[in-house]
Amino acid sequence: MRYLRSILNTTNKITLALILSLAISSCSMMHEDMDGCKKELRVRFCYDMNMDFIDIFTSPVKTVTLHAYNLNGDLVFNKTEKVSDIAADGGYMKLDIKPCIYTLHVWAEGEERQPNSYIYTTSGDATNDIAKLDCKINRTTRDIQHDLTALYHGYSKNVDLRMEDYGTKTVMVPLTKNTNNVKVVIQNTSGKKLKASDFDFKIDDDNGWLAYDNTPVMDDSITYRPWAQYDGSVRAMNENDTQVSAVVAEMTVNRLFATKHPRLKVYNTNNGKMVFNIPLIDYALLVKGNYNKTMTDQEYLDRQDDYNFIFFVDDRLNWLNANIYINSWRVVLQNTEM
């Protein structure tokens, strides 16, 4: 009997010890600092502002810099992280801040094309002023004659990261790609061979400096010039599928705005005459409706990041402006004075 009582006492002690252990390790609202009782805040980044309308964040984006500002406008969190590390950690960036309401800001970059393509926070200390989280193309002259590393932006106001209990809370910050590749192809319809040196290409704009909210900051104009220019033979845009001589120029430009008026200009270097001078935005938007999606002009410009233009010239390098091709769509021009 004494042996049985001893076993029961031992069992009761073990049971009590287990109950106390569970109580100590449980997450109580009154013991926020206990080990194992955590409130974890995380941010997931999304890049579906593209023409495929799907999230491809982990593919083109390589590094992310996240800033978090509290309701007083103070910078309380700042971290730069490789996207490969974010993906390895489950696809999230962890925030080491208290649960509250924050404004989240992101500058992100893709695969490096040109080292130090941008200068960030050029207008002053952003510790107490999110408006100073600007981004400017790194340049010493008006002309940009090199490729630019892809630039992305994210900005979410009044993000609710409050938590009433322990656990994990995740919010999403969508990104917009700012940089665009513009490829200009000039084909000769007469059979005359074209040389890359026959033409001078440029795009004049004033979008080299962007504010914290991705809007343009008043700045000197900027001229984008080709980082690649070459000649060769291409398939003619006709039913005969013949090969014709062509010159190709590739330029990378910063964010395009529906309210601005950049100009794409091409000159004949043999005589200095202008081949054409067209409004880039107006021409880019000519094919927006062909994608069968409801988009504002600005949304289309933000989703589309690859613009391919094909122009035709005669044997004197004069522009044959009856029609052009934009992103493989044939466009019959009614007004070449746009």
What is each stretch, according to the model?
Residues 77-177:
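Short, low-hydrophobicity acidic/polar segments
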Residues 33-51, 174-187:
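A short, Gly/Thr-enriched small/hydrophobic beta-strand-prone motif that recurs across taxa
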Residues 253-338:
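Hydrophilic extracytoplasmic domains
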Residues 28-32:
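Bacterial signal peptide processing site
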Residues 23-26:
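C-terminal motif of bacterial Sec signal peptides marking the signal peptidase cleavage site
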Residues 64-118, 195-291:
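Tryptophan-paired
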Residues 142-241:
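A sequence/structural signal for flexible, mid-protein segments enriched
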Residues 2-16:
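Bacterial N-terminal signal peptides that target proteins for export
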